[in-house]
Amino acid sequence: MPNFVADFHIHSRYSRACSKDLSVAELAKWAKIKGIGVLGTGDFTHPLWLDEIKTALRETGTGLFEAKNGTQFMLTAEVNTLFYKEGKAHQIHHILLAPSIEAAERINQELEPFGSLSLDGRPTLRMEAWRLVEVVLGIEPRCLVVPAHAWTPWFAIFGSTSGF
């Protein structure tokens, strides 16, 4: 079986604590050097980053996108859901994967009322996790919603400090 390397949990320069030098072209260059077969775009929820994605990548019709150097990308974003249960705050990070620009744009339209998408590449949405899944899959059933860094203490579905 051939080896295949993918990284879907990545961020743009619009996320806190990330390099301001990040660009789609730089990500494509380094993915090629490191042997990554498919790289997530990260942060498709941020309007300026989505504009760059649309300019820098070509949609292939397979759910993947291609950079000028041939690097394959998948549309990804990380969001933080913030909700309260039994008087206790819970925050969970999720990775969203979308098969098309149209799906990403529709997701952004539906999520904007729950939190400003332009403040951070990893926006905080005031909604329960189940509602996020319902919204995203209701837009496009081929989308995926998966917990990010599930075992870390902070902002993880199984995290010791996530409020569960």
Regions found by a protein language model. Give the residues of each.
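Extended substrate/RNA-proximal surfaces in nucleic-acid metabolism proteins
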Residues: P2-N3, D51-F164
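Histidine-centered catalytic micro-motifs
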Residues: V5-S15, F44
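Generic enzyme active-site microenvironment
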Residues: D7, T41, T76
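Feature marks short, surface-exposed loop/turn motifs that line or immediately flank catalytic pockets
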Residues: Y14, L48, F83
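Short, flexible loop segments at the rims of nucleotide/cofactor-binding pockets, characterized by
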Residues: Y14-C18, G121-T124
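Short, acidic/polar
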Residues: S19-A31
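Generic structural signal for well-ordered secondary structure
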Residues: V24, H46-L50, A89
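Divalent metal-dependent hydrolysis catalytic cores, especially in the metallo-beta-lactamase
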Residues: A28-P47, L144-V146
